[in-house]
Amino acid sequence: MQNCKKSNMEILIFFIAHWYLSLFAQSFFHHRYSAHQMFSMNKFMEKVFFIYSFIAQGSSYMSPKVYGAMHRMHHAYADTEKDPHSPKYSSNIITMMVKTYHQFRGVQNKTIEVRDAFYKNLPDWKWFDKMAGSLVVKLLWAIAYILFYIKFATTWWMFLLVPVHILMGPVHGTIVNWFAHKIGYTNHDVDNTSK
């Protein structure tokens, strides 16, 4: 019985740690630093946070450059057809996730036209983003999550958390973008559903 409780704790600790470490990477490095340039850091620290983001986000690693450009597009085009992830143009949360994924891939692969201004001063480490965002690396992360659960999960339902690990970044983004627009609040009047 002691072993069962230990394994449950390991799964719980792993899930909570992955959730918050990934959320911090997205909030601190991708959102506040990359998209909004709320503070500055030297190139060495930038690379430290690229690596931190890769470890924390794992299979859902997002290029800070692409994230920053998309987030700037979101602010510039809030609640219009050009907004890369407004719930106003999605019938449900899943269609918004799929649309956002296609927008992200389009910006990443340069199949969607993006104004140069949206790329201004964004952190850029091309080879690292290419490696960290590759399908092979994403699959290796997914396998690592599955192996962790094989070793420590004590019941079948714990494996239902594995897809959340695999899609952690998009899950965070969806929660913020769907629910903040649908049920959030504002401190001042805005002419869109941003909250």
Where are each of the predicted segments found?
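Non-catalytic, topology-defining segments of multipass membrane proteins
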Residues: 1-174
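Alpha-helical transmembrane anchor segments
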Residues: 160-195
